[in-house]
Curated annotation (Swiss-Prot):
<dbReference type="GO" id="GO:0070181">
    <property type="term" value="F:small ribosomal subunit rRNA binding"/>
</dbReference>
<keyword id="KW-0694">RNA-binding</keyword>
<dbReference type="GO" id="GO:0015935">
    <property type="term" value="C:small ribosomal subunit"/>
</dbReference>
<dbReference type="GO" id="GO:0006412">
    <property type="term" value="P:translation"/>
</dbReference>
<comment type="similarity">
    <text>Belongs to the bacterial ribosomal protein bS20 family.</text>
</comment>
<keyword id="KW-0687">Ribonucleoprotein</keyword>
<keyword id="KW-0699">rRNA-binding</keyword>
<dbReference type="GO" id="GO:0005829">
    <property type="term" value="C:cytosol"/>
</dbReference>
<dbReference type="Pfam" id="PF01649">
    <property type="entry name" value="Ribosomal_S20p"/>
</dbReference>
<dbReference type="InterPro" id="IPR036510">
    <property type="entry name" value="Ribosomal_bS20_sf"/>
</dbReference>
<feature type="compositionally biased region" description="Basic residues">
    <location>
        <begin position="1"/>
        <end position="27"/>
    </location>
</feature>
<dbReference type="InterPro" id="IPR002583">
    <property type="entry name" value="Ribosomal_bS20"/>
</dbReference>
<comment type="function">
    <text>Binds directly to 16S ribosomal RNA.</text>
</comment>
<feature type="region of interest" description="Disordered">
    <location>
        <begin position="1"/>
        <end position="28"/>
    </location>
</feature>
<keyword id="KW-0689">Ribosomal protein</keyword>
<protein>
    <recommendedName>
        <fullName>Small ribosomal subunit protein bS20</fullName>
    </recommendedName>
</protein>
<dbReference type="GO" id="GO:0003735">
    <property type="term" value="F:structural constituent of ribosome"/>
</dbReference>
Length: 86
């Protein structure tokens, strides 16, 4: 348990950041699931629209440090390839 005043403050800040990051990560995963669902349904228009929504979200999460930039690039590349194959 935090003993000093500064350690208590840092613990509070860390918990606040953890909750914020969890919310952002959940939002990102939700949009990714929508894209996957559209691809699996074979609906190219819906998949393209979902991809257009999820792309800037992945970029933003990578910029903020929530995910690695290579992970964002990998997801975008795989989504694009799957949509192109429809």
């Amino acid at each position: 348990m935090a003993n000093s005043k500064s350690a208590k403050k840092r613990a509070i800040q860390a918990e606040k950041r953890r909750q914020h990051n969890a919310s952002r990560r959940s939002m990102m995963r939700t949009y990714m699931k929508k894209t996957v669902a559209a691809i699996e349904a074979g609906d190219k228009e819906a998949a393209t629209a979902a991809f257009a929504v999820v792309t800037p979200i992945l970029d933003r999460m990578a910029t903020k440090g929530l995910i690695h930039k290579n992970k964002a690039a990998r997801h975008k590349s795989r989504f694009a390839a799957q949509i192109k194959a429809l």
